[in-house]
Amino acid sequence: ALFQKICSKENLKKHVESGTSFNTATGWMEVQKRIRKSNNWERMIKILSYAAAVLVPVFFVGISLKYTTHDYFSNKSVLIAQPILPGAAKAILTLDNGETINLNKETADALQTIEGTNIQIDSTTLNYQLAQSTSVSPKPVYNKVEIPRGGEYALVLSDGTKVHLNSMSSLRFPVAFTTGKREVELQGEAYFEVSKTGQPFIVNANGMQVEVLGTTFNISAYPDEEYQTTLVNGSVKVSAEKGESLILKPSQQATIALGSNSIQVRTVDTSFYTSWVKGKINFKDQRLEDIMKTLSRWYDMNVVYENEKLKNIRFGCNLNRYEEITPFVKLLEKTEEVHVKIEGNTITFHN
């Protein structure tokens, strides 16, 4: 019984995962206690022989496991050929005439003037500045900024409104706002800091419409996910495509489920939903599939599930948005609920 207890799979795993080899002194003390309880010399000889058989091999097995196998248990089935790196600032600007410009370091400091608006491009931000000395055409001229997988980019509109676009997102907007309202079209996710000009600012996002005067909010409107508007400060009006409309207060979030025209409102910690703008990615009790949708857009990677049930396992974690994905993978492995294999830019989950 003593041998089985010491060498059981659970006991060895316990010592190996804690980074320690088997404690021979503790094992010997346990043997001695049993010896003292027995007055039978033959039984003592038998126990001593068991002890010798147990302690000597286990001592060396423990040392061997500590220095040669501990990494295996720590990483279990993690296979990483090369690290999957985080995204970076990159985008494509499409002008009204169809011309496209890659927004990266090579196009930094490029300066153009379109319909009386100066466009300043640097490595992370696209800045539209209305040239006061130039007349603006009454007909709106539109530009579009598209963010690929593994990208993000910041944008300052001609009215001073700041927009931070997330991966796989796009914003279509007028170079200069010429009518009584400011209106843009969003797909994906963006964080808005709307300047106060007295004119309504309207965001059309896949059937959801958000109207404000001057405020800070986050919109997530990816085509395969529910639509969310999270209000940081100010006031916004949220409207479903063919349904109700309502006014949000600060710290409230409006959600429209896919295929629905009803709006659900709840109070939230807004920093949780806007942390991506500040270099963090937070998850709280979320399905693995939903977590990986977010991460795959940012890390530009493919995700495979060998067992469909793994998609519904729930996790929570806080990540540095600008680190490679390895720390996250190790966190998943420690739960022992899922194992991970990484090959190229594909991450595979299995039992």
Regions found by a protein language model. Give the residues of each.
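N-terminal amphipathic alpha-helical interaction or autoinhibitory segments
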Residues: 1-8
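Generic detector of short, aliphatic-rich beta-strand segments that form the cores of beta-sheets
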Residues: 3, 28-35, 254, 347-349
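Prokaryotic Sec-type signal peptides and long signal-anchor helices
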Residues: 7, 19-22, 26, 63-64, ...
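Short helix/strand-capping connector loops at secondary-structure junctions
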Residues: 8-16, 309-316
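Positively biased amphipathic helices and basic secretion/translocation or surface-docking motifs
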Residues: 12-46
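A residue-level detector for the "anchor" residue at the start of short, highly conserved motifs
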Residues: 39-50, 60-351
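Extended, solvent-exposed functional surface patches
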Residues: 56-58
